[in-house]
Design a protein with these regions (language model features):
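Functionally constrained cores in energy, signaling, and assembly domains
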Residues: 12-13, 26, 43
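Beta1/beta-strand and adjacent pyrophosphate-binding region of the FAD-binding site
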Residues: 1-13, 31-33
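Gly/Ala-rich phosphate-binding loop of Rossmann-like dinucleotide-binding domains
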Residues: 18, 22
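Conserved N-terminal/central alpha/beta ligand/cofactor-binding core
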Residues: 35-114
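Short linear functional motifs in flexible/disordered or boundary regions
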Residues: 29-30, 87
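Conserved S-adenosyl-L-methionine
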Residues: 23-29
Length: 114
């Protein structure tokens, strides 16, 4: 199959890139390739008893897979310039907050909780 766009990685950046492309160009054929396992098969072997620390799995189920490392987080986003990154240094504080709010709106529209 031929694609117009191929995105490598289904972490937040890849997911949002595909989302934005679909909005702007609905007929665009997009493929997202991810090295990790499907969400329902992602499981870290650390159990605290037999396996107490990272064993360097070939594909880390915490880091790799749909949603990236954020798939298993509590889902909180920091909508501030005070901590958590330096995006504002590149696009300005006002635009950074607007972009953070935009991402939050999309997450809420797709089942996120406030």
């Amino acid at each position: 199959m031929k694609y117009d766009v191929i995105i490598i990685g289904a972490g937040p950046g890849g997911i949002f890139a595909a989302y934005e492309l679909m909005k702007k160009k609905p007929d665009c054929k997009i493929a997202v390739f991810e090295e990790g396992y499907p969400l329902e098969k992602r499981k870290c072997p650390i159990d605290g008893e037999k396996v107490k620390s990272c064993i360097n799995c070939k594909r880390c189920s915490i880091m790799c897979g749909f949603g990236g490392a954020g798939a298993f987080s509590d889902g909180k986003y920091n909508i501030t310039n005070d901590f958590g990154g330096t995006l504002f240094e590149y696009i300005g504080k006002k635009q950074a907050v607007e972009l953070m709010k935009y991402v939050d709106e999309i997450n809420m529209e797709n089942g996120g909780e406030g």
